[in-house]
Regions:
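A short glycine/serine-rich beta->alpha loop
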Residues: 137-143
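Catalytic and GAP-homology cores of small GTPase regulators
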Residues: 1-132, 139, 148, 159-227
C-alpha cells in the first residue's frame, strides 16, 4: 500500500544518504586523516563518548570502507597515542585467523594498509597482529612471545629474500637459527619452519610499493635492536 511505499522510499534514501556520507568521509580521510575523522564524528558515524567506542568505530571504518588510502590507515594505526593503539587493537581483532597458516594470516593483514616507515610503529603493528593470531590459535604456540618473534622473523625473511637492497639473502639454516635463538616454542610439525621459509621464498607477501616501507623493512634485519 501507499504507507509501505513511503517507508521503502525513505529507507532507500536513508541508505543513499549514508553511502554518500561515507564516500565523502573517505575522500576527506584520504586528503587529511584528521579532517576525515572529524567529519565522521560530525555525521554521527564515530561515537567518541569513550575511548573504546571511538576506537571501535574508527577500526570499523578502516575495515569496511572501500577506496581508503592505505598509507593513511597505516600511519594512523602506527601512532603512539591511546586512540591509535586502541584502534589498532580492535582493527587486529576484526580479523579471524583461526586455523589459518601464519603466513596466510600475515598476507590477509598486510593487504589492508601500508606499513609505516618508523621502526617503533612497525613493532606495535606486528605485536597486535601476533597477539590476535596467538589468541585465535592458542594451542600452536607455547606463549604469546613466540607468536610475536615468529611473526617478526617472517618479516625479516621477507626482506632478506625479496628486497633488492639485500645482497646475500637468507638460507633456511640462517632463518631457523634466528628462530631458535629467540626461543620460539610451540606445537610445531617437524617441517614447520622450513614450510614457512619455502612459502616466502616462492610466493612473497604482497606489500604496497612505497620506499618508506622498504626502508623500514630493511631495519628489521637488525634483529638485535628488537632484543
Amino acid at each position: 500500500d501507499y504507507a509501505d511505499k513511503v517507508n521503502l522510499y525513505m529507507k532507500e534514501n536513508t541508505n543513499l544518504k549514508k553511502k554518500y556520507e561515507l564516500q565523502t568521509a573517505a575522500t576527506k580521510f584520504n586528503e587529511n586523516i584528521k579532517n576525515g575523522l572529524l567529519y565522521l564524528k560530525s555525521i554521527g558515524y564515530i561515537n567518541d563518548s569513550t575511548l573504546v567506542n571511538e576506537a571501535k568505530d574508527i577500526a570499523s571504518f578502516f575495515r569496511n570502507t572501500p577506496n581508503l588510502k592505505k598509507q593513511n590507515i597505516g600511519e594512523f594505526l602506527g601512532e603512539n597515542t591511546d586512540l591509535s593503539i586502541t584502534t589498532l587493537k580492535y582493527f587486529a581483532e576484526s580479523f579471524d585467523f583461526k586455523n589459518i597458516d601464519i603466513v596466510q594470516a600475515l598476507r590477509m593483514f598486510l593487504l589492508t594498509f601500508l606499513l609505516p616507515g618508523e621502526g617503533q610503529k612497525l613493532d606495535r603493528i606486528i605485536e597486535h597482529f601476533s597477539s590476535k593470531y596467538y589468541n585465535d590459535n592458542p594451542t600452536l604456540f607455547a606463549n604469546a612471545d613466540s607468536a610475536f618473534y615468529l611473526s617478526y622473523g617472517i618479516m625479516i625473511l621477507q626482506t632478506a629474500l625479496h628486497n633488492p637492497n639485500v645482497k646475500d639473502g637468507m638460507s633456511l639454516e640462517e632463518f631457523s637459527k634466528i628462530l631458535v635463538e629467540q626461543n620460539i616454542q610451540g606445537n610445531f610439525k617437524d617441517d614447520y619452519f622450513s614450510d614457512i621459509y619455502n612459502q616466502i621464498l616462492e610466493d612473497p607477501i604482497s606489500l604496497p610499493e612505497l620506499e618508506e616501507s622498504k626502508q623500514s623493512l630493511l631495519k628489521l634485519l637488525r634483529w638485535e635492536d628488537l632484543c
